[in-house]
Every structure is written in C-alpha cells, then in structure tokens.
Amino acid sequence: STRKESSAASDVYKRQCYARSFDNGVTWYKANGKKYDLPIRLGNAEYACRIPQNSELINQTSMSADAGGNPYIASYWRDPDSDVPQYRIVWHDGQMWYSRQVSGRTTPFSLKGGGTKMIPMARPRIVVDGGEIFYVFRDEERGSKVSLAHATDVANSKWSISDLTDFTVGAWEPSHDTELWKSRKRLHLFVQHAKQGDGERVVEFACLLYTSDAADDSLRVD
C-alpha cells in the first residue's frame, strides 16, 4: 500500500508499505513471515520502499509474486532531483527489499491539482514467471500505445521495451486475464480505447456499437 498523509493535500502519497494475509484479513504478516501485531501503524509497518512526499507517487498499482511467494510491486514516482516520473519495480528476494527503475522517460508532469487527473502514463500492470518480469504500461511518450517492458532477471537484466499495438489506446489502464495467467501462464490483455478529461471534464468520444438481431445485423460508430 501507499501511505497517504492527508486527504486535503493534492500530492500526499509517500512510502510503500507491505503486509499480506492468508485468511481474508484476520491476521497479517510481513514479507519475512513475521506476524504483525495489529493494528498496523506507522511505527510497526514494513517499508518496501521509502519515498519522499511530493514525489508524484501513484496509488493503486499492480503486484505479483514468484513461485516462492516473494512480492513484486509495479509503480511510478520521480526522484527528488528530477521532475520526470519513472516507472519502477520494487521487490523482495526473500531476504530484503530492492527497487529499480524500469523506464527512461523524459517528459515531466505532476499529479497536483483538483479532481481526477488525465495522466499521461498509466498505472502499470506486472506479472512474474520465475525471475522473469513482464511489465505492461501505456505512456504518452510512446504514442499512448500498449507497451511492454521485459526482463529475464529483475535485478540484473537490461529492460527491453516494445509496443504491442501500432495504434493509440488513449487513457487506457492495463488489465489482464488473471485466471488464465494463474492457470496457464498466458498473458492476455484486455484493451479498449478510452478517454478522460482532466479534472472530470467531459471529452468527445466515439465508440463502436454492434447490433445483432434478425432485422439489423450491423456495426456502427456512435
């Protein structure tokens, strides 16, 4: 989870903390298997990554785990000496926490401001197979396409980034068939072009509507 300092501020997320439960939230454990004394507070939380406030840290991102149950967290934030947020991965190898930059972005932006932001980079989605990482994202820098960062070794491999589509998906946020990945290790993405106005503003948008009946079997743009 990301810690939120105050709901009244506009850029308040900081730190990434970790806890897991095997009984639907009755008991909670740290990455090393140690049981939490509830409630979880600032003083007893396990910190996966300490991130300063006002770092453009995004909330509600994706997690995965390897065969040993070690967690991998996909997120983005910016370094204190930069105004460019970068995609990151945070993981636990069974002994300690690590973090690594995934992207090499050059475009600055800020999450500050009222309402829901039209964000130029999507919340990433991650899946892990052994030590192999598949990191799905959408970035305005790459034409807002469906993009994939891949590494065969999370700690040492160079990231290979490619676009999976040759068309824009607008404000799409990555999602995948979690059950198919869990059962067969096949990564199927749900893709739909989407739009969002900054601060809940309305935007014009066309969609395809398929009508199928005896009188009208057609595809049209609405």
Predicted regions and their residues:
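Asp-box/BNR beta-propeller loop motif
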Residues: 21-32, 89-99, 103, 151-161
